[in-house]
Amino acid sequence: MNKFEIINELSNIEELVEVKKVIDYALKTEKINNVIFNIIIVDNNYIQKLNREYRKIDSPTDVISFALEDNDDINYSPIRLLGDIYISLDKAKEQAKEYNHSLLRELSFLAVHGLLH
């Protein structure tokens, strides 16, 4: 059984209900089981601070993942604590407009991308 939460640090985003369904589908399709993780929706300022502190890049990014386990731990634990996936809503909106698709598609892409890292 998988357990994840989408934590929205910003305003109400109706697309997040559908993003959750996309993540459930990706987990099932990729046969990823017994994992726990969070997806945290933040703004450009917050994700830039994370990017600067942990990657030494002083600019916002669209998604950044923090793993709680090393790959070596995967085979030994019945439940895997994957960690946290931070997504910049500002970047997601910019990129959805740039690529001429919906915010739902962009948020879903970023969430799955962050999960599979």
Question: What is each PLM-predicted segment?
Answer:
Residues 107-116:
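Active-site His/Glu-centered metal-binding helix of metallohydrolases
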Residues 1-107:
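An acidic/histidine-cluster motif and surrounding catalytic segment
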